Amino acid sequence: MSNMQQKTDVILIGAGIMSATLGSLLKELAPEWEIKVFEKLASAGEESSNEWNNAGTGHSALCELNYTSEKADGSIDISKAVKVNEQFQLSRQFWAYLVKSKLIRNPQDFIMPLPHMSLVQGEKNVEFLKNRFEALSKNPLFQGMEFSDAPETLKRWLPLIMEGRTSNEPMAATKIDSGTDVNFGALTRMLFDYLKTKNVELNYKHSVENIKRTKNGLWEVKVHDMNSGKIEHHTAKFVFIGGGGGSLPLLQKTGIPESKHIGGFPVSGLFMVCKNQKVVEQHHAKVYGKAKVGAPPMSVPHLDTRYIDNKKALLFGPFAGFSPKFLKTGSNLDLIGSVKPNNVLTMLAAGVKEMGLTKYLIQQVMLSHEKRMEELREFIPNAKSEDWDIVVAGQRVQVIKDTDAGGKGTLQFGTEVVSAADGSIAALLGASPGASTAVHVMLEVLEKCFPSRMVEWEEKIKEMIPSYGISLTENPRLFQDLHTSTGRTLGLNEKETVHN
């Protein structure tokens, strides 16, 4: 099969949650289209989407304090929190559609109800949290949130965190029971199992080596079949690059103007995992703290109940690490290989600007197990070193680009779609909130790349995702109806009652 040209309609690069979501949307909207997936690893959902390689938070800004910034006058800007929550609702609706249509089954294998909590210490932070609570409580998306600074209430909400605490420093927490823990690895595998039944061709252990434009305007993808050692050439009208940290180098190979002046900075994550099941059972929430002054947004510490392989686990982190690899399974040459003549100045400018981040990463890399335990004990005063191990999570490649607001070499902390002007190719770059907003991001890919089909597809999109194109903040009744119905379909409402 070496060097044979094989034509198809759509090529998806990377078998993670993004390609799984886009493939699932396309198979519902254009079932006749032929889709091929190429994945370097031996199975789906093994890199960034894997359950051990991300925090598993259904990011909806219920507890993540970095989505609500404090203005100069002390008031709270909730616009980003509302945006992230609205985006998560789209994912929740699409997953419910897939379950209701029996396209995927057993939602409890990928999503569980779990209280989302914010926890702060110190008078100033308590005031910030109270102001945040008051601002969010006015929005229908955040109804049901509770605030308390009463020690007795905190002991009831957070027994493991409050036990053995000797400091008299003021503390406060917010709690909302409608949060979720999402196993994106399990969900990814379910979606690809469904796509297989729809005749999507899944090619594992197939590494994409190059992407180039053909004379007739198609895209030719050069693929190394790692099973046979052969080289294959596949052409498609549309290509999506959803390779996590590996997307940037592939985007650069396309040569599209939109790929210029973009760099990537890899940050690895470490979590501490509790191996004492008695301790695990004493905690039932995702509890997010506040990032230390000067620390980057991805450093917000959190203590999380997780459900992995249907077993309850307890993780704390993240601690940052540094590796020049763009993927956990990548190469030490990834970072240097991504520096091109068109982005070298952008990368250098970021290096000068981000000395604080560099210093932070160096400090994090140098931490011993006992130093990490000291940070954990800010959450769990009685934590014992022998109860906790380190797990290396996935690589995240933060986007570096030139922006009007930030100037040359500005580090971006979001998720970003880069597409060709004609919509024939798109890539997903960046990190948080990532997988939680997969449906929103893939709808953005459809809007950018298939604008002429959107009118035709709109009715089906709204059947799958009823709030598409609608602000739920401005339609509280619709939000309540959808939240109840999706909760019922995904098995969240009943379990919320059981756990709480």
Curated annotation (Swiss-Prot):
InterPro entries for this protein: FAD/NAD-bd_sf (IPR036188), MQO (IPR006231)
Pfam family, one: Mqo
Associated pathway: Carbohydrate metabolism; tricarboxylic acid cycle; oxaloacetate from (S)-malate (quinone route): step 1/1
UniProt cofactor(s): FAD
UniProt keyword list: FAD, Flavoprotein, Oxidoreductase, Tricarboxylic acid cycle
Enzyme class: oxidoreductase
EC number assigned by the record: 1.1.5.4
Any one Gene Ontology molecular-function term assigned to this protein's record: 2-hydroxyglutarate dehydrogenase activity
Catalysed transformations (reactions): (S)-malate + a quinone = a quinol + oxaloacetate
GO BP terms, alphabetized: tricarboxylic acid cycle
Membership in a protein family: Belongs to the MQO family.
Name assigned to this protein: Probable malate:quinone oxidoreductase
Lineage: Bacteria, Bacillati, Bacillota, Bacilli, Bacillales
Name of the coding gene: mqo
